[in-house]
Amino acid sequence: MKTANFSFALCLSVVIMLFIKCTRSEQDLSVTKDAIAQKSGVTVSAVNLSNLIAYKNSDHQISAGYYRTWRDSATASGNLPSMRWLPDSLDMVMVFPDYTPPENAYWNTLKTNYVPYLHKRGTKVIITLGDLNSATTTGGQDSIGYSSWAKGIYDKWVGEYNLDGIDIDIESSPSGATLTKFVAATKALSKYFGPKSGTGKTFVYDTNQNPTNFFIQTAPRYNYVFLQAYGRSTTNLTTVSGLYAPYISMKQFLPGFSFYEENGYPGNYWNDVRYPQNGTGRAYDYARWQPATGKKGGVFSYAIERDAPLTSSNDNTLRAPNFRVTKDLIKIMNP
């Protein structure tokens, strides 16, 4: 890793500029800058942290992002991003854990480095569980079994990792016995996560579906509904948010877009962000959009670590993120 021979005074100024509250200007968050930040031991001032936390606790449209663990620098050599590079003004980061086995070094880095760092900035760290099949195919298929399964999730991700909540990804409309099991599993989870738990831990329902029978039966148990609106129009957002309106407040509703994933074209390609980055595209439309029945909860992104200066809409090069789009959207939603 290359480092520059800066004086201590210059190093100090770079670090302070990098970590002050809600940075919204464009920055090239290079590997060198991260090395300087970690080696210096300099932290954000108590005043700046206080202001940042106050912003996070205020009534505002939140920004959330799914972070792909297999592209983190702690996961494998050759990767560039670090969760410490995420914008300070990001409200919530979703740990998306594919291709990262339990023995990978990422998990210890998450627990001992990333989570404390992000918590100091008021950023919530949420684990993505995927669907609920693990509850319905393993262990006891009864209330005792579901309760044990849910407690195990809480003990691991809250007790061991000190995370702030969970995300379930439901991309189907379960029926019959599967519906019954999914509802029971969700009720078990809601004793530890969500507005009915009393724990303060967040429960996110992430979906690409209109309200299903499963959702209708479990709606009061979630803090947020994240709609995977990749490739859609704002007209569609208005329609779908109207379908959810009888069951949740619009402040709980967040539409989401996707950054371009490397090697995604043409099969996994949404064109939600225009490249080279120029401040336009579907993601910006989502930030400006509002439901017909109230203000939205915010916007989320998938593959947030791909918020980088790509040269084209199908640039497959792994590049260091600059988070320009994320910071632009935060500013649009909360001017």
Curated annotation (Swiss-Prot):
Domain GH18: 61-321
Glycosylation site list: S73, S89, S143
Entry-linked Pfam families: TIM-barrel_EndoS (PF23916)
Reaction(s) catalysed (UniProt annotation): an N(4)-(oligosaccharide-(1->3)-[oligosaccharide-(1->6)]-beta-D-Man-(1->4)-beta-D-GlcNAc-(1->4)-alpha-D-GlcNAc)-L-asparaginyl-[protein] + H2O = an oligosaccharide-(1->3)-[oligosaccharide-(1->6)]-beta-D-Man-(1->4)-D-GlcNAc + N(4)-(N-acetyl-beta-D-glucosaminyl)-L-asparaginyl-[protein]
PROSITE patterns: GH18_1, GH18_2
A single Gene Ontology CC term: extracellular region
Keywords: Glycoprotein, Glycosidase, Hydrolase, Secreted, Signal
Signal peptide start and end residues: 1-45
InterPro entries reported in the protein's UniProt record: EndoS_F2-like_TIM-barrel, Glyco_hydro18_cat, Glyco_hydro_18_chit_AS, Glycoside_hydrolase_SF
GO molecular function, one term: mannosyl-glycoprotein endo-beta-N-acetylglucosaminidase activity
Enzyme class: hydrolase
EC number: 3.2.1.96
Positions of the catalytic residues: E171
GO biological process, one term: carbohydrate metabolic process
PTM remark: Carbohydrates at Ser-73, Ser-89 and Ser-143 consist of (2-OMe)Man1-4GlcNAcU1-4GlcU1-4Glc1-4(2-OMe)GlcU1-4[(2-OMe)Rham1-2]Man.
Localization annotation: Secreted
Record function comment: Endohydrolysis of the di-N-acetylchitobiosyl unit in high-mannose glycopeptides and glycoproteins. Complex biantennary glycans are the preferred substrates. Tri- and tetraantennary glycans are not hydrolyzed, and high mannose glycans are very poor substrates.
Family: Belongs to the glycosyl hydrolase 18 family.
Subunit record text: Monomer.
Stated name of the protein: Endo-beta-N-acetylglucosaminidase F2
Organism expressing this protein natively: Elizabethkingia meningoseptica
